[in-house]
Regions:
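Short, low-complexity, intrinsically disordered N-terminal peptides in bacterial proteins
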Residues: 1-7
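Long, amphipathic, Lys/Arg-enriched alpha-helical "connector/arm" segment
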Residues: 112-118
Length: 118
């Protein structure tokens, strides 16, 4: 199924790899994160149009990542990919609003440093 979201994703991937010159591994990470996100939207929510995505959809996706056992760092990285994608969609006039702008990344667990004892 080649829809508005996947077309926009292809444009986004071209943009970050060619125009922004991001490293190949970074581009692959963005693409993997966003394909998973867009697939979830299509299969769970029936959303294939980027302008139909709402803040609640993104928040539900992040909650799903939590249920899947993703670490806080993984969720934060995936959400950063989603933020970049939605900013790009707004810049391309593919959406009327960046619904991801107010979705916050989960807090990472704070680890106390090991204490050196003698």
């Amino acid at each position: 199924m080649y829809n508005g979201s996947t077309r926009l994703l292809d444009q986004f991937i071209a943009h970050i790899s060619v125009e922004r010159g991001l490293a190949r591994a970074t581009v692959r990470a963005y693409e993997s994160d966003l394909r998973r996100y867009l697939s979830w939207l299509a299969h769970t929510r029936g959303i294939t149009d980027p302008d139909a995505i709402g803040k609640a959809d993104i928040e539900e996706y992040v909650a799903q990542l939590d249920s899947d056992g993703d670490s806080a760092r993984s969720k934060a990285r995936r959400l950063a990919s989603i933020h970049e994608f939605h900013r790009f969609a707004l810049a391309q006039h593919a959406v009327s609003d960046d619904v991801s702008a107010t979705v916050k990344a989960p807090k990472s667990a704070q680890m106390l440093p090991d204490v050196l004892t003698i």
